């Protein structure tokens, strides 16, 4: 956007709003994808603390947790949303007076205060690949980030993204003009922000700054200057770190409501402003059909990333993302061996930790984890990330299905606060050891495989998988025994380790277990099926001897929290069969 210094951007309306108001130099969406990001906004809570971090998880909330518009309605506000919701939690009251394409503040009672959200989808990921497209910006003029290869598809998609952001700006201009025609400009506080980073691969879905950073512009008319952030100045900027988790408490504060204790953000405006936070946090978990687990923190300059699934590459095949031409072209060039190290990083296994200097390296391609001069910063941010996970009782350390099974009769949030149901420290310690590298921890990993808690056993198996051939061979007996563990998630990881790294007989054992657990029926668990299918896909030709069974796997029909799970399972089965040269119902 032009107001953020991009010389190619054509965003005159938001630029003008920034000149009249103030922009935050660094704002994060908390999650680099829509549903968990919007869950953060609507609750004022970090989704990993309530079990809502996975796409379309639809978890229940504790009774006292309400969507923030419900608080505004109690204050007399007419609350409208036009029209996207896409939250990862279920509730009987979304808080809105109206939420639809027709919802509008003009429908309020005369003189009634209003709170209105207008969503624009014209710059959505799907619009980057819409063809035909009337070009405005010349693809030759765009700056290709250091992590992307410089090819025609990348340039075309980046140029088209600039064009559709200009359309989003035009829609913002229409809404501001509409407000002005209603005589409400000097009566109304305005926020403008994005959903998450761009829809390009390594933007949306990935918790680098390119996926988390969003524009955040606020305008306070003179009438309401007393409610503005303390540093507010027309045409100014703020170095305060603003996260989507801060929006709900801020909006309540603007309405004169003290944010409830269960909200985890910090109000940056209104009558209950709080001091600037030292850090901002982000996360990545299951993105559509693909599992991952990443936590991040920034102090505004340095960005620390902790990968809890380093045994998965960044660029796992997400069907929806690979429809975009630049994504497929990027993978094509990687397979051809034409990329440099920075451009190849996305398609390789992750390191356990990453540290980037956002000022010196805005594209985040120079990992400073091994830099002696950055050792103190690394330790500080590592501790901040660990402290945050403890503070919020991060539920990401449980396999997704266990979030649901352990919270039967209650909610994931309440379960997560109960040490009897979620012994956090034991599980967190097991995950920390599992996702490091080196053989020294192997005795502890084997011990964890025999632990009473299934999540500790799960991380024991992950730790062996993460360490590869040698650890798998040294733990062969324990892994074979784990194929019969009462936890299906332990079985999946043990089977994947054997399937990837063991001798032929044990490879076949692993494949048999994964094929069995992939079978999603009305009596089975969709989360187990998805975990098993993800693992099966990573075995490629090793699973070919069970091709006919894989072709017959059901693509839906079992219970799930959301209708999109049918598509997730279909995508996973389809990708596995495609790699084996087949398709559902078609013999190889």
What does each model-found stretch correspond to?
Residues 1-347, 362-383:
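Formylglycine-dependent sulfatase
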């Amino acid at each position: 956007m032009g107001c953020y210094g991009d010389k190619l951007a054509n965003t005159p309306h938001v630029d003008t709003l920034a000149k009249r108001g103030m922009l935050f130099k660094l704002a994060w969406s908390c999650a680099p994808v829509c549903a968990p990001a919007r869950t953060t906004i609507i609750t004022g809570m970090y989704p990993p603390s309530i079990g809502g971090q996975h796409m379309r998880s639809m978890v229940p909330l504790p009774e006292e947790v309400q969507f923030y518009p419900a608080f505004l309605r109690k204050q007399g506000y007419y609350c409208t949303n036009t029209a996207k919701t896409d939250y990862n939690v279920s509730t009987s009251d979304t808080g809105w007076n109206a939420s639809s394409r027709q919802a509008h503040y003009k429908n309020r009672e005369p003189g009634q205060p209003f709170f209105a959200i207008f969503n624009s989808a014209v710059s959505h990921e799907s619009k980057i690949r819409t063809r035909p497209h009337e070009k405005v910006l010349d693809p030759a003029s765009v700056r290709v980030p250091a992590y992307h290869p410089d090819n025609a598809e990348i340039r075309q998609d980046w140029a088209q993204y600039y064009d559709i952001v200009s359309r989003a700006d035009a829609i913002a201009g229409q809404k501001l003009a509409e407000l002005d025609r209603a005589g409400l400009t000097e009566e109304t506080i305005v926020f403008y922000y994005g959903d998450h980073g761009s829809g390009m691969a390594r933007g949306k879905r990935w918790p680098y700054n390119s996926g988390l950073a969003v524009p955040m512009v606020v305008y306070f008319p003179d009438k309401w200057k007393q409610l503005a952030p303390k540093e507010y100045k027309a045409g100014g900027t703020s170095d305060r770190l603003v996260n989507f988790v801060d929006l709900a408490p801020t909006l309540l504060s603007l309405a004169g409501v003290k944010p409830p204790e269960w909200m985890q953000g910090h109000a940056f405006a209104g009558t209950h402003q709080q001091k600037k936070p030292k850090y901002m946090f982000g996360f990545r978990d299951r993105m559509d059909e693909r599992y991952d687990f990443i936590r991040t923190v920034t102090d505004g300059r340095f960005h620390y990333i902790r990968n809890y699934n380093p045994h998965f590459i960044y660029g796992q095949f997400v069907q929806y993302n690979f429809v975009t031409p630049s994504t497929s072209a990027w993978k094509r060039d990687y397979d051809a061996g034409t990329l440099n190290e920075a451009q190849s990083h996305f398609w390789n296994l992750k390191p356990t930790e990453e540290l980037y200097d956002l000022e010196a390296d805005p594209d985040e391609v120079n990992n400073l984890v091994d830099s002696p001069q950055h050792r103190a910063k690394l330790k500080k941010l590592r501790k901040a990330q660990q402290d945050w996970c403890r503070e919020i009782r991060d539920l990401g350390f449980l396999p997704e299905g266990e979030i649901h099974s352990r919270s039967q009769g209650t909610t994931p949030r309440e379960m997560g606060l109960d040490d009897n149901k979620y012994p956090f420290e034991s599980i967190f310690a097991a995950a920390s050891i599992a996702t490091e590298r080196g053989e020294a921890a192997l005795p502890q990993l084997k011990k964890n495989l025999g632990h009473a808690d299934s999540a500790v056993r799960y991380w024991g198996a992950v730790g062996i998988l993460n360490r590869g051939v040698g650890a798998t061979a040294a733990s062969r007996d324990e892994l074979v025994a784990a194929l019969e563990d009462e936890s299906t998630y332990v079985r999946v990881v043990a089977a994947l380790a054997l399937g990837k790294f063991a001798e032929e007989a044990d490879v076949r054992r692993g494949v048999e277990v994964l094929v069995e657990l992939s079978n999603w029926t009305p009596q089975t668990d969709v989360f187990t099926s998805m975990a098993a299918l993800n693992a099966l896909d990573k075995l490629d030709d090793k699973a070919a001897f069970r091709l006919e069974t894989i072709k017959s796997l059901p693509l839906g029909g079992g219970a799930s929290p959301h209708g999109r799970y049918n598509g997730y399972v279909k995508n996973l089965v389809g990708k596995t069969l495609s790699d084996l040269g087949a398709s559902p119902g078609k013999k190889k």
